[in-house]
Amino acid sequence: MRLARIVLSVGVSALAVATVVFAFGGSGIELRDADRGAEARGGAEELQEQYDETQDRLEALALARRQGTLGVIERIRRAPAPGWAGERIVNRTGDDWEPAIAADPNDPFVYILHNRFGGEPACPSNCPDPAMILRVSKDGGKTWGAERYLCACRRVHGQHDPLIEVVPQTGEVYAVWMNDFDIHFSKSPDHGKTWSTPVPVYGNVAWGDKPNFATSADGQDVYVLYNGPTGGDVHAAISHDAGDTWEQVRVTNDERYHFAYGTAVLPDGRVVSTQNSFTYSGPASAAEGPVLQHVYSSDDEGKTWSEAVIDTLELGTVCTSELCYADFYDSGPALAADEDGDLVIVYSGASEPEGPRTVYGRSSTDGGRTWSSRVALSPSGVNAAFAAAAGFGDDTIRIYFADQRTGRWNVWYRSSQDLGATWTAAVKISDATSGTAYKNAKGFIEFYGDYGEIAVTDGGKTIAVWGEGPSYLGPGGVWFNRER
């Protein structure tokens, strides 16, 4: 969930403890005594916006239930591409969005983490809505176990921005998400059966949004990049003891609002984060001006960071679906690292204001210090966005993106075995042609949520996950597809 419609510079230092308690009256948030500290940290207007949007989604969900348009309403017909199993929905009736996925590189475990609006509560009372839902597969995504709540997290209004990774050397599973605007970390030693008590990563930073994270191969070094309370500056939360304790570093101090979409810890310990940034100085705090594509990196365990702007693009075609904000399709740059630490960044943007976006790729063989010329990965003149990327082996990269070449959205897959010098032809993996009110043979109406993800199983097979819906408002669902 990208906070983009209300942009504030909160009147506290990025490293100062918030001491003011905010209260909402009327139909707004009712503060619970035990949770006033967390509410104060989030900022009144941001929390109210998040709460109001959730209420809008719950109303749309209730309406869809009454009208019989929620979830799967007819047989799902598929037309899988060769080598693919066919698109499937994670839950037939859930209002699910913004999924994350991780695959164990040494065992056939795959994990999908997403949040759900209006689902069965995780606890008897004072439970978050939306709440984090975990699904685990023991066979590379062929079959899936029962849904589990990652954390009941009582006295939290809503959980957002799920992230999940597998520690390569141990198989331990790490997760990061937001309780309201408080970013937390938890880990599982037993393939998602049990989870540690969530640990806050934010220290004295007043609130955080849009986290992205990565871990070292042994799981000791964990880096969470996110935007903070000073007008969207970049912050880093850093742990060198497998997530038990955290320190925070402010990375930027500028006039732009940043969003983290990719993070990698390279074999030599270098940390790389890919982000885009906006200025929200237009009417009603709308985005205006160019969109910058950034690479941030650290060679000293997160103490200091360098920045490179690798491209400058324009805000593209505006989103006009219900509840949507104009720059929703201006999604951020995905990052893939292979086993040697070579990198590919995949991002999108328009060449002229409100024009169609193109998805581009660039590669780096020196840890993100320098980058190749950009290569277009999506068709010219067709609006494209929502890239995801994963590395595998030596120089192998798997990506997907979504575009509107049919007049509706579809998800397309491409791969490269030479670090992005050449790419396979695009294959449609959103191949279900029926089943819900928002799907037909041309595709689905709206991408649901800011992002999805792609992963590679221990057998070298690709598995990808994303959200689809009738509008930005929803209700929609999480879908996935996998290579056979």
Protein language model annotation of sequence segments:
Residues 13-26:
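Hydrophobic alpha-helical membrane-insertion segments, chiefly the h-region
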Residues 1-13:
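N-terminal Sec-pathway targeting helices
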Residues 26-484:
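Extracellular, repeat-based ectodomains that mediate carbohydrate processing or recognition
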Residues 10, 21, 474-475:
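Cleavable N-terminal signal peptides
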